């Protein structure tokens, strides 16, 4: 947990009574569906817009963290849906002094002949307002009549917090995470394992022990890109059940590598629980994987499941964190600038319920792990 973060119990107290206002009917624990024992909760919101999921998962090292995580995910999804008060306008890209849509990495077939819908965003690095395509802000996204859609909308960079600064930091960590993951996925390597056996972090040791006791092999992989912000994947292989649908992973990013590892481990536990939970309602992904078979799925994803090319210890990963969200934001912006990423935008999506939510956009960061149709310069220059 970030040193400046509000305790999860306080977050639950502050925002819990607002869940009914956004249509959440219940938050339920699904930890028991799996045998790992790492807390996972699920929030159900039947009123979610068409094109968006209505069940959200939450993770954490404690039950309180996991419950708060599921709750905040629900507020994020609600806030990302278009609302009547959202001020947007339409214009052809050539007639708008806004962000170049191409910098968002468009699918190869995109033709910018039609008008786009725009919304003003704040530039964290320059203080001025800049119009950005609304397609990169709202989820789900349905363009107004006469306007085109640029790509399938997603939730990358959508984040909440107890305060706006915290939400911006979380959103920034997510877009950096997806970029690092995209680069690894597109290159299919190199696999560098993170050895945590010597860690004195009791939370990490406890999480790893839970997987070990359940007979689930977990490998931690260093995905950190040139941005220098620690990004770690936790890759789980259930050697007891040998169920291909349970070949799962989680990814975590933070200036503090220990927090990145904790996020990755809790997320892979969440991936397992939601996969087990989800297969009871939606069998498409699980059925595909089960038809392919356990060994074949591991071969198809050998860049995750093969022997590592190198190993580092957790202590070798650089800790860039400060004691404040503001300090962490400043360091992150500096690291992005050093990688040639000058602009960081955010749109404040805080709604009438008062839970701080933003969408963070960093033009140039890769999104291949979210949308394989979109391949940018960073991937092309690294392959």
Curated annotation (Swiss-Prot):
What PROSITE patterns does this protein's entry cite? YCAO
Q: List each copy of the YcaO domain by range.
A: 58-383
**Where is the region Disordered?**
80-100
What the entry lists under NCBIfam families is as follows:
methan_mark_1, YcaO-type kinase domain
What protein does this entry describe?
Uncharacterized protein MTH_987
- Provenance organism: Methanothermobacter thermautotrophicus (strain ATCC 29096 / DSM 1053 / JCM 10044 / NBRC 100330 / Delta H) (Methanobacterium thermoautotrophicum)
């Amino acid at each position: 947990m970030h040193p400046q973060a509000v305790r999860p119990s306080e977050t639950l107290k502050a925002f819990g009574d607002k869940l009914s206002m956004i249509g959440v009917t219940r938050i339920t624990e699904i930890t028991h569906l799996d045998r790992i024992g790492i807390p996972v909760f699920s929030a159900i919101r039947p009123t979610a817009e068409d094109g968006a999921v209505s069940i959200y998962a939450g993770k954490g090292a404690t039950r309180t963290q996991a419950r708060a995580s599921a709750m905040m995910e629900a507020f994020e999804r609600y806030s990302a849906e278009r609302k009547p008060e959202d001020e947007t306008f339409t214009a052809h890209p050539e007639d708008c002094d806004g962000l170049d849509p191409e910098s968002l990495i468009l699918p190869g077939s995109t033709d910018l002949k039609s008008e786009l819908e725009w919304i003003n965003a704040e530039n964290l690095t320059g203080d001025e307002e800049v119009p950005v395509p609304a397609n990169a802000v709202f989820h789900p996204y349905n363009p107004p009549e006469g306007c085109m859609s640029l790509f399938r909308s997603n939730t990358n960079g959508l984040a909440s917090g107890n305060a706006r600064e915290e939400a911006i930091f979380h959103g920034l960590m997510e877009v950096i995470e997806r970029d690092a993951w995209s680069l690894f996925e597109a290159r299919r390597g190199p696999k560098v394992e993170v050895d945590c056996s010597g860690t004195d972090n009791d939370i990490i040791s406890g999480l790893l022990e839970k997987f070990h006791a359940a007979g689930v092999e977990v490998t931690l992989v260093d995905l950190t890109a040139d941005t220098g912000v620690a990004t770690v994947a936790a890759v789980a292989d259930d050697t007891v059940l040998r169920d291909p649908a349970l070949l799962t992973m989680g990814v975590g990013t933070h200036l503090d590598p220990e927090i990145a590892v904790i996020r990755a481990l809790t997320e892979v536990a969440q991936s397992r629980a939601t996969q087990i939970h989800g297969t009871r309602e939606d069998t498409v992904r699980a059925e595909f994987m089960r038809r392919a078979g356990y060994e074949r799925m591991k071969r198809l994803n050998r860049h995750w499941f093969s022997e590592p090319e190198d190993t580092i210890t957790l202590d070798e990963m650089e800790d860039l964190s400060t004691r404040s969200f503001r300090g962490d934001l400043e360091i992150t912006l500096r690291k992005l600038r050093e990688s040639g990423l000058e602009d960081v935008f955010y749109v404040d999506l805080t709604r009438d319920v008062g839970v701080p939510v933003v969408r963070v956009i960093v033009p140039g960061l890769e999104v291949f792990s979210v949308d394989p149709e979109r391949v940018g310069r960073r991937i092309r220059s690294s392959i």
